[in-house]
């Protein structure tokens, strides 16, 4: 964990981190596949008949130049605790790759270090498409497209606490927002800013008016939809003495369901269209794939039984729990049963310069134990508990319908 923390890398470019993880897993005698969605690493253990449990760790760091451990070149830092996830996944592999353990289990386990959980902005996406990434929004989405989860039956994920939690562990998946994004280009008309500004169409004024309209729309958002709107102006004219004829904005709509995301995106689009009409400009937009909302899942019995074996406090997810943030784990929850827990052991803010691991046992060791114990309980006794979870789970999408949804809504070209 400390080595990975000292060498942070951005999404889809985690080459050093991936090589480090692959070497460790090979050292355990596992069959390792690398270069998945550029940098993903998957190691297989047992490979026998029965359910597959896929344990996930995320490779990438977050852009945070102000963090004291930020890379001076790429500007990223492990201020979201992904290095702790990798440590937990590796620790679980150490515990499970034991002949005596294997003899008592049915099924298989995959240890999957995945790239690019953090949001990839529009400019980088264009480059990634040229590099052959079909769904460049996130690593998990691209890995679904590539079929790298085709053999998975149950997914185990973990993260540092993403909500205020006093206990050591939070078991289950709290519902989370999903989001969609757009790259909006506002076309106006250039004119001299002093001599004849009335002959111009100010693209920045169109943008400002649209954003003000969105502010006035907030009373139309239902509380249960947890809507959040974001606009970042990437460009607003070229010179100070000319009416801006072009503005470029990257937008994001967060909400708690796919329907709410779609409805709110339409409102945002109408704001830009209406402002452009009022000033005599035009709008061009490029829909960008986001993340799907996380579907709530309570604490599974196997996980709660496992955490009781640790010297740790915990609480279980409740249907009313909600996290306004987004993660591409949401996409997985629409296809697979995802058993999740979060953990403490850190201080400071997620994605902040003050994020710091304070309790290494709680942040690195105990999560590894909980992953291993949960996996063991899923696959022991002829994998009875794993089979029950798979039998009861009702997916929203399969791989084909998921990929078609992305193509239909976000124009992602493969």
Regions found by a protein language model. Give the residues of each.
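Sec/Tat-exported extracytoplasmic proteins
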Residues: 1, 8, 100, 147, ...
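Divalent metal-coordination and catalytic microenvironments
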Residues: 4, 43, 55, 82, ...
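Histidine/acidic-residue-rich, glycine-tolerant segments that coordinate divalent metal ions
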Residues: 42, 67-77, 83, 99-230, ...
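Non-cysteine beta-strand/loop elements that form the S-adenosyl-L-methionine
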Residues: 54-56, 65, 182-187, 339-344
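Metal-dependent amide/peptide-bond hydrolase catalytic core
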Residues: 205-414
């Amino acid at each position: 964990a400390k080595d990975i923390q000292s060498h942070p890398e951005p999404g889809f470019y985690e080459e050093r981190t991936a090589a480090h993880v692959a070497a460790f897993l090979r050292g355990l005698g596992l069959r390792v596949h690398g270069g998945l969605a550029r940098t993903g690493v998957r190691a297989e253990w047992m490979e026998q008949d029965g359910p597959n449990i896929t344990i996930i760790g995320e490779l990438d760091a977050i852009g945070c130049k102000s963090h004291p451990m930020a890379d001076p070149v790429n500007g990223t830092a492990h201020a979201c605790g992904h290095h702790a996830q990798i440590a937990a996944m590796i620790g679980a592999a150490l515990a499970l790759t034991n002949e005596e353990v294997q003899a008592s289990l049915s099924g298989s386990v995959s240890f999957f270090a995945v790239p690019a959980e953090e949001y990839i902005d529009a400019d980088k996406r264009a480059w990634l498409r040229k590099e052959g990434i079909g769904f460049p929004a996130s690593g998990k989405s691209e890995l679904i497209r590539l079929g790298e989860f085709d053999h998975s039956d149950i997914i185990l994920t973990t993260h540092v606490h993403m909500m205020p939690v006093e206990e050591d562990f939070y078991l289950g998946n709290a519902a989370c927002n999903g989001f969609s994004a757009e790259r909006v280009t506002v076309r106006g008309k250039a004119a001299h800013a002093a001599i004849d500004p009335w002959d111009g169409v100010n693209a920045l004024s169109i943008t400002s008016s649209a954003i003000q309209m969105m502010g006035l729309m907030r009373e139309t958002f239902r509380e249960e939809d947890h809507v959040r709107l974001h606009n970042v102006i990437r460009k607003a004219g070229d010179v100070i003495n000319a009416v801006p004829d072009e503005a470029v904005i990257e937008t994001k709509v967060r909400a708690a369901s796919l329907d709410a995301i779609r409805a709110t995106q339409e409102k945002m689009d109408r704001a830009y269209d209406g402002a452009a009409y009022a000033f005599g400009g035009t709008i061009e937009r490029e829909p960008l794939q986001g993340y799907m909302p996380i579907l709530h899942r309570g604490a599974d019995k196997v996980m709660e039984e496992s955490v009781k074996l640790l010297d740790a406090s915990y609480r279980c997810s409740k249907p009313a729990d909600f996290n306004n943030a987004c993660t591409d784990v949401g996409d997985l929850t629409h296809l697979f049963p995802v058993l999740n827990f979060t953990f403490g052991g850190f201080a400071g803010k997620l994605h902040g310069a003050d994020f710091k691991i304070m309790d290494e046992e709680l942040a690195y060791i105990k999560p590894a134990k909980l992953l291993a114990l949960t996996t063991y309980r899923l696959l022991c006794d002829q994998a009875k508990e794993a089979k029950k979870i798979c039998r009861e789970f009702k997916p929203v999408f399969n791989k084909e319908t998921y990929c078609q949804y992305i193509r239909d809504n976000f124009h992602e070209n493969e």
